[in-house]
């Protein structure tokens, strides 16, 4: 478990910032956050305005979705890592930020991500998930490769050839859902269940009310979107039928993994809810947010990087007798660095929330600040992992940043709710899919550059993940 040292010779400073007028200032901050400035600029502007990386903020969505939106934000690498210390930060019902989905989204249960490590159920549930992954590790590569071929690359190439462009983001959900479902459901095809071909759509509908209060879909006029999605929580009834189909499909198909839960003393119904959360938030939403950034950065880097990646990948695979194995993938240092760099620049979950369990002192690079017991706090990870006092050229995509001596900087890669040099365990809050996400990020590059030499993309910025359209694909030279 990460522990945070409060010992410091830095000067003690009052936390700067101003919550402003009740409700009015919070609504203005919300419009700036979602529409006028955007997330990155909003946090940077707060730090610049108050000349501090520990500041008071009104955190979106604010009124009237939440009554508890007056937070303290940690915007540098030093202060941010206190969020990982279980003795200081309580994570109970703070996963989604200042609001929480109703228990009806999980049949009255609270998945492990919503409970703190002090909860007596935490260790059992987290241990169960980690064990389930470990027992299926031999399936990761073959199942993901099949999904990439059947549901992504073949369609990508066909659309580029026939239409001159292919929407990468539109193809991702079917690929990721197929992989996840088969992995956790004894290799059952989701199309053979009550979900049919609509599994990704049912999952997206179930996720939408849980995520949209903290996001901007950019598909409606600002005032309409804000009124509908940031002032009120969407009633569960709108997506109840989608949820019921998901529960039915996983209850009937994930037989082995549910049997494992019962052997550990976990109720089958509770295990289903934890699996559904794992599928929806940890894996489906995470992979669909991360993958566009990966191909955006690699695509914009151009043919030189593509040539280097293709050479490394094909050389290692040839040396391994033509087999794509975990051992082979682990030898690809540039591929590994590219994935780490993407996770550093654009973590799938950019915000970490919690409440102080006790009074403590938090340090930025320049000062110490007192955090009072019960204070709601948030860390904005893209600023922490792009801290200019930690990384050179922090806002640039540097493909080989984590190669050779650069590996020592991995402790500052924080995307998984923990340091990259640490591991998820039953007694911490680090993402249980940490190693799987990194493996899949590498594997998608390996599969891609075994097929293609280079490519070009068209990028459309969205609130967090960009939309990536492939414009050209050059097949691998013999």
UniProtKB/Swiss-Prot annotation:
Provide the leader sequence positions. none
- InterPro entries per record: Cyt_P450 (IPR001128), Cyt_P450_E_grp-IV (IPR002403), Cyt_P450_sf (IPR036396)
Tissue specificity as recorded in UniProt: Expressed in roots.
| pH-related activity note | Optimum pH is 5.5 - 7.5.
Q: Name the catalysed reactions.
A: (9S)-hydroperoxy-(10E,12Z)-octadecadienoate = colneleate + H2O; (9S)-hydroperoxy-(10E,12Z,15Z)-octadecatrienoate = colnelenate + H2O
Residue sites binding heme per the record: 431
One Pfam family from the record: p450
Could you tell me the EC number(s) of this protein? 4.2.1.121
The family assignment reads: Belongs to the cytochrome P450 family. 9-divinyl ether synthase subfamily.
What biological function has been recorded for the protein in this entry? Involved in the biosynthesis of the anti-fungal and antibacterial toxins colneleate and colnelenate. Can use (9S)-hydroperoxy-(10E,12Z)-octadecadienoate (9-HPOD) and (9S)-hydroperoxy-(10E,12Z,15Z)-octadecatrienoate (9-HPOT) as substrates but has no activity with the corresponding 13-hydroperoxides (13-HPOD and 13-HPOT).
Q: Which PANTHER family match?
A: 9-DIVINYL ETHER SYNTHASE, CYTOCHROME P450 26
The name this protein carries in UniProt is: Divinyl ether synthase CYP74D2
Source organism (scientific name) = Solanum tuberosum
